[in-house]
Amino acid sequence: MVSLEDAVIARLESHGERFEVLVDPDLAAEFRREDSDVSVEDVLAVQEVFRDARKGDKASEEAMRKVFETADPLEVTPVILRRGTIQLTAEQRRQMIEDKRLKIINKIAREAINPQNGLPHPPKRIEKAMEEARVHVDPFKTVDEQVNIVLKAIRTKIPIKFEKVRVAIKIPGERAGSAYGVISNFGKITNEEWQNDGSWIAVVEIPGGLQDSFYQKLSELTGGNVETRLIK
């Protein structure tokens, strides 16, 4: 649940009445998506419907029943979020855009590669390409909704594409147990087997941009006792 300090106002005016709720701006934007599984309880900072949230004036039950046919905040809030507007101060909007921009950059850095050499782009290079391409970030759209649009825009500045790579790994048996969960978090284990010498080998499919961090983590987990090979 978002704190009152970080909450923003979602507002709906209908039938001559005004209704406001205090919400988490990111979760409110996510909630408005048709396929969202975000709960209304998580979106709300406080389970109250206001006539004027800044003054703390609550909406009357009579007004809510007239417009929504219910006075339950958990039933009223979804209607306000989907039909109303989310109010942001200039600073809140700036911060939301900056946060969303960084999330987009990090996702692209994790999942994209330079097709010319198969290596990931550093986040700073992606950030610079976005600036040069004059990319607009929408604070109310999710990262997934915007990332392909951004990728298309920055392709005019740098060679880049989303691609998964397959990596073959071999780890001593005594290290396999602790490494398995970490490896699974990086990507999908498509093949695995135990060798006669007790070692564990596997083929893992990971986002291309994660190669460096994947190899580094494997080295840390095994004390450097790991073999890897990029499968073309």
Swiss-Prot record:
It comes from the Archaea. Gene3D superfamilies: 3.30.70.240, Ribosome maturation protein SBDS, N-terminal domain, SBDS protein C-terminal domain, subdomain 1. GO terms for biological process: cytosolic ribosome assembly. InterPro entries: EFG_III/V (IPR035647), Ribosome_mat_SBDS_CS (IPR018023), Ribosome_mat_SBDS_N_sf (IPR036786), Sdo1/SBDS (IPR002140), Sdo1/SBDS-like (IPR039100), SDO1/SBDS_C (IPR046928), SDO1/SBDS_central (IPR018978), Sdo1/SBDS_central_sf (IPR037188). Belongs to the SDO1/SBDS family. This is Ribosome maturation protein SDO1 homolog. It comes from Methanothermobacter thermautotrophicus (strain ATCC 29096 / DSM 1053 / JCM 10044 / NBRC 100330 / Delta H) (Methanobacterium thermoautotrophicum).
